[in-house]
């Protein structure tokens, strides 16, 4: 399946998945032809993130507005790990089981920052749910003026105890999402067969990881997230992603005896904190697992965090899986021309339309 340049940079017509000609990108074939089987990827990723089960202990309070019902509360994903949750749902729903969309924020965000999107989804008939990722929002643990997320990642990097290793860079929040689905699936107002997920940037990467492995997620729309960590590292394009947590990378470079952040210490940093990210847990590998469920990948042309050549590898890998499953009608991608790393209004519209179509 050949994905040519013009296809990537041409705006999609409505929500009809892009038609792709036969073949596969040569770069994808060469770099990812020996990817582990989807079953192995799922098994290995689940094992990596496994931790002792705990009671969810959910608690919520409700507030009714003129048009939506808002619930604020929490559940526990681990014995001492409280996950704050924000839920918007249509007032008119009553006791009806609702389709659900989980919305994950990006670096520097929190669940409150997703409220406009939650409201919009609720007005369209969905229950919409956001959480604070690890060390964000109500889960910040650093003193005022510090970046709790970066501090936690730095601490995890410097942790000498391999048995008790945190993974605050993506992986721990992915585990929280799985437990969130555990909780939501028990609610009488949720249709467990109609659960979707979207995320922006960091949240989009977490969406790819969580949804690819968890078959309870029926529809997914990762935004400004499709990429290849392997390609970025090998082609010296890791800087955009690294700058989102730059101080942690600076500390890692210093700890390794380097005067600056470089490819070698970035690789060591990723290897410890997001093991497998340039191999079986890279986006082009994990994205295959979502087929044949409906998937829409939304990227921008000038995104330095998710360089387009790496994104193309992810697109091609997904397309190959969907073609093999005879499900190309359920796969779509779009690249917004001349846009940097941001969720554009047009892509937000496309995301909601995708859920309305498939969920």
Mark where each language-model region is.
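N-terminal cap/lid segment of alpha/beta-hydrolase-fold proteins
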Residues: 50-95
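Active-site glycine-rich loops that stabilize anionic/oxyanionic intermediates
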Residues: 79, 104-109
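Short beta-strand element of the alpha/beta-hydrolase
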Residues: 85, 96-106
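Cap/lid segment of the alpha/beta-hydrolase catalytic domain
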Residues: 96, 107-175, 229-236
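Primarily recognizes the serine-hydrolase "nucleophile elbow" in alpha/beta-hydrolase
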Residues: 178-244, 278
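Mobile cap/lid helix-loop segments that gate and shape the active-site cleft of serine hydrolases
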Residues: 219-286, 307, 311-315, 323-328
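Short beta-strand/loop motif that positions the catalytic acidic residue
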Residues: 297-299
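C-terminal catalytic histidine-bearing segment of alpha/beta-hydrolase fold enzymes
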Residues: 315-359
